[in-house]
Amino acid sequence: MSDHDYDVVIIGGGPAGSTMASYLAKAGVKCAVFEKELFEREHVGESLVPATTPVLLEIGVMEKIEKANFPKKFGAAWTSADSGPEDKMGFQGLDHDFRSAEILFNERKQEGVDRDFTFHVDRGKFDRILLEHAGSLGAKVFQGVEIADVEFLSPGNVIVNAKLGKRSVEIKAKMVVDASGRNVLLGRRLGLREKDPVFNQFAIHSWFDNFDRKSATQSPDKVDYIFIHFLPMTNTWVWQIPITETITSVGVVTQKQNYTNSDLTYEEFFWEAVKTRENLHDALKASEQVRPFKKEADYSYGMKEVCGDSFVLIGDAARFVDPIFSSGVSVALNSARIASGDIIEAVKNNDFSKSSFTHYEGMIRNGIKNWYEFITLYYRLNILFTAFVQDPRYRLDILQLLQGDVYSGKRLEVLDKMREIIAAVESDPEHLWHKYLGDMQVPTAKPAF
């Protein structure tokens, strides 16, 4: 008989951890999830992309998600603070104001996706459903239990120190999965965390009841899209996400220095930012704020390693950049999906050395690299993003990214084309789009981590 309590201990019961537990439990792997909070709890990151659909179907939770009656998300839209004509620079299919854009997810077929929509979710309810589902499949789930430390003895032998109030318990496992989100428990413990060299984002957000979503669009069929409103403030935008029929999540995302240099409280900063979009500001003021403002900092970081002897990092515990394209839950679910395959094989082979997880390492680094480069190119020249969305030559390639379909292991050529155009704009101060360049520098094609 094994002297291990579990094959795998999973730190964190958010979407990454619960999805990992579901895959492992379905495969007969003895696993336990330790979540320091008691669900339900509030959490940001409320809009999904279609790349989450195959995962939700595979682990068998989709029916429960559907019964929760979360708003359906058929598409996404981006609105501009600018007005007036602009040179189209040879792009095709652009309308009179191509600084705005919109997409329907069903314009492009995606493997494993069986519907035209995904969901906007109340993360408190969504995360609880996923965690309870993992338990129903046979994973052990412990809430209100914090992991204080992890001791790596040898590949296949790990001691996890768990705390419940003043009581400490040692748990023996063959390996650990860090799904602790932005707490990045193992990343800090092992000295793996690195601050992102480009991003230093900051968000302020709340929920509003009876917000008039028609203020963002004249099309009734689009009121339940996610809306991203560009603001005239550098590197600043607003999300607008339906949560229920009447409640809308609204948040301002900016570079942290924009906030710290303002001498405003974060609530004052929120209102000053949205004031630059009159329709949005007026609609928010006419609604009822039903949650206190919350701020999210420490947004952007990476890890020097995402796996090693007896450990794997997934979801936000592995990487987080920026929420502009709703990538967070998709990265959580897909990193769990990819890593679970390696872990199941490691358990079968009783081999928990780093080499057992190299498939996951390559796949997730490539997928997140695609997200990262897409996001940085957007911030460098967002008028180029909206031009590519509208141009039929590039629309489906951009839609692939917006669907979250980035885990094929292949290089996405559309990113090279965007980079090429940005380089031309950067090198020519007389270029008609030069004035739209953001102040974030596009990194090399191969990130440092």
Swiss-Prot record:
- How does this polypeptide assemble, per the annotation? Homodimer.
> E.C. number, please?
1.14.19.56
Q: What is known of its domains?
A: Contains an additional unique helical region at the C-terminus. This C-terminal region blocks a putative substrate-binding cleft, suggesting that a conformational change involving repositioning of this region is necessary to allow binding of the pyrrolyl-S-PltL substrate for its dichlorination by PltA.
Give the catalytic activity: (1H-pyrrole-2-carbonyl)-[peptidyl-carrier protein] + 2 FADH2 + 2 chloride + 2 O2 = (4,5-dichloro-1H-pyrrole-2-carbonyl)-[peptidyl-carrier protein] + 2 FAD + 4 H2O; (1H-pyrrole-2-carbonyl)-[peptidyl-carrier protein] + FADH2 + chloride + O2 = (5-chloro-1H-pyrrole-2-carbonyl)-[peptidyl-carrier protein] + FAD + 2 H2O; (5-chloro-1H-pyrrole-2-carbonyl)-[peptidyl-carrier protein] + FADH2 + chloride + O2 = (4,5-dichloro-1H-pyrrole-2-carbonyl)-[peptidyl-carrier protein] + FAD + 2 H2O
**Residues noted as binding chloride in the record, renumbered to the chain:** S327, G328
What top-level branch of life does the organism fall under? Bacteria
Q: Which family does it belong to?
A: Belongs to the flavin-dependent halogenase family.
GO biological process terms on file = antibiotic biosynthetic process
Keywords (A to Z) from UniProt: Antibiotic biosynthesis, Chloride, FAD, Flavoprotein, Nucleotide-binding, Oxidoreductase
Query: Its pathway?
Result: Antibiotic biosynthesis
Entries under Pfam families matching the protein: FAD_binding_3
Protein name as catalogued = 1H-pyrrole-2-carbonyl-[peptidyl-carrier protein] chlorinase
Query: Which EC class, in a word?
Result: oxidoreductase
Q: Which InterPro entries match?
A: FAD-bd (IPR002938), FAD/NAD-bd_sf (IPR036188), Flavin-dep_Halogenase_NPB (IPR050816)
Coiled-coil segments on the chain, per record? none
Task: Tell me yes or no: is Transcription regulation among this UniProt entry's keywords.
Answer: no
- State one molecular function term (GO): oxidoreductase activity
Task: Say what the protein does.
Answer: Involved in the biosynthesis of the antibiotic pyoluteorin. Catalyzes the dichlorination of the pyrrole ring of pyrrolyl-S-PltL, generating the 5-chloropyrrolyl-S-PltL intermediate and then the 4,5-dichloropyrrolyl-S-PltL product.
> Which residues does FAD bind?
A16, E35, R41, H43, V44, S47, R123, I147, D316, V329
